[in-house]
Amino acid sequence: MLRALLLISACLTASIAHALTSAEARGMAIGDSTSRIEALNKAATDPDEKTAAFIQALADDAVKTAGGTVFIVKDDKATDPVTGAALKLPDDAEDVTNNNLMRGELDNALASLKLFSKDPKARADAIKTLASG
């Protein structure tokens, strides 16, 4: 709950969103849960649209990695999370696995992002998600 409140506070004070970098995408997708959550919380403090889309892709289990490269896979098509460019998915690409702790943090990050939605229902749902976390 404290993390969620800190994330909300950071989002409210952020003035300019910075673009998702390859290093941030790798940090959120590769490594142990603790380091991935740290990278997620850092990226979610002032996200751009690509960062928000990448967080959603992580939550949707639509992210794979191979050789330190991160891919978003949708409809059997791989794209670069930073540029959006189409990429060839290597045969040895592995699914990014989210344990329950990571899933909870992804849900909180997505809810925090939805606090700024123009849709009142989305904002209300976000508040409920954060309050229950």
Enumerate the language-model features and the residues they cover.
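Sec-dependent signal peptide recognition
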Residues: 1-8
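N-terminal signal peptide c-region/cleavage motif recognized by signal peptidases
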Residues: 14-16
